[in-house]
């Protein structure tokens, strides 16, 4: 997987702090309704996209990366989202083995900011 260049002088924790609010656990609504409403406002962009969801206790990241690598090697356009990240929010999103660039992630988060605020999306939901 190719990693985007991160400025070593920049604080990676704060690189998107103005667009991704801190995670607050108390009183948080963790139901799917908020995300379903947000997706409906976007005309359900994922409705016709084939997807593989990897769930379980251990090994999810490894299995998801292997599936992503296999699909990309087979010539299929493949995306991967993972959580958590180690040093940069960009680590969470890859398409065809290419990590999203910080500028591109910032632009997309900025475009979706009104929707994220309207539906009170969590940081994880904003990155999906």
Where are these regions (language model features)?
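Positively charged, low-complexity intrinsically disordered leader regions
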Residues: 1-50
């Amino acid at each position: 997987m190719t990693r985007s260049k991160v400025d070593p002088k920049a604080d990676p924790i704060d690189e998107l702090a103005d667009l991704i609010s801190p995670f607050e656990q108390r009183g948080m609504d963790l139901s799917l309704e908020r995300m379903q409403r947000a997706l409906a406002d976007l005309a359900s962009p994922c409705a016709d996209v084939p997807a593989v969801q990897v769930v379980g206790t251990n090994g999810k990241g490894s299995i998801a990366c292997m599936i992503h690598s296999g699909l990309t090697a087979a010539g299929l356009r493949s995306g991967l989202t993972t959580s958590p990240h180690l040093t940069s929010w960009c680590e969470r999103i890859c398409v065809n083995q290419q990590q999203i660039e910080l500028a591109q992630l910032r632009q997309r988060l900025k475009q979706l900011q009104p929707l994220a605020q309207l539906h009170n999306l969590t940081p994880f939901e904003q990155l999906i």
